[in-house]
Amino acid sequence: MAALTGDFGPSSVCLVIMSFFCRLFFIFSFSFLVLIAQAEDKQKSIRALLVTGGCCHNYKYQSKALIEGVAKDAKVDWKVVNEGGSGTSARIAFYDDPNWAKEFDVVVHNECFANTVDEKYIRKITSVHKAGVPAVVIHCAMHTYRAAKIDDWRKFLGVTSRRHDHQSRYPVKKVLPNHPILKGMPDNWITPKDELYIIEKMWPSAQPLAKSKSERNGKEHAVVWTNQYGEAKIFGTTYGHSDATFDDPVFQKMIARGLLWVTGKLKD
């Protein structure tokens, strides 16, 4: 300390040391607060599982468009499972874990496996939803497991469908125009080119929100609906065949609001 002369005496050294530790304390405190804020922000995000894949659709593109579109209206952390290949029958290994949905607030089903008929496998999925895990179901999810003899998946969806009309641009008529999921949907919305699914049965637990009319026979079919399956809220739409539909802002907002609604986070 002999080199410390003049004004740079012991008191100055103490001030320097105190200043250093104050700055260090500030840095650590700030970093800690940032970590807390990030953790809280993470907790506010909806944890969503997207199950996709199977026959007849561009699922890689649709997944990307879905995630980007929903992000305009909802903060969501996604996990995408695309394990079933591109055929009509698959057993996704992800479901083998009895706690497969434990980490998620909602499951989005946009898959197409019409010829999977294994009842035990199907119930691995539906039992978890019936216990309370909400879901959003899109397009060919309604034809998934359609060859199965059991109705568990159909009751989960809220509708039974096994076929569809041709592709066209279908006008959408709101039947519950004040439902919060439909907020922002124009009264005159016409879909991009898509398929109209023929609804054979609307299950008693389901409520149609919007319908479209068949160009073949004029019959109306539900195209947007909600369902209560056990303890879980379900939102569904049969539209979603084309990439253009997934790019459509009205469709994107509807899916986002449906996802928020089933998770209890839709505030307006």
Positions of PLM-derived features:
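Catalytic beta-strand/loop cores that center a nucleophilic Ser/Cys/Thr
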Residues: A71, V76-K79, E103, R162, ...
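Helical hinge/lid and interdomain linker segments adjacent to catalytic or ligand-binding clefts
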Residues: D41, R47-V51, Y59-V137, A141-H143
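Bacterial N-terminal signal peptides
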Residues: C22-V34
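Active-site rim elements
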Residues: G53-C56, Q167-R169, H241-D248
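Sec/Tat signal peptide C-region and signal peptidase I cleavage site
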Residues: L35-A39
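N-terminal secretory signal peptides that target proteins for export/translocation
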Residues: M1-C22
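Extracellular ligand-binding/catalytic regions of CAZymes and related secreted enzymes
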Residues: D41-S45, K72, K102, R216-H221, ...
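A glycine-rich, often tryptophan-bearing local segment used as a flexible ligand/cofactor-contacting loop or short
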Residues: A114-G184
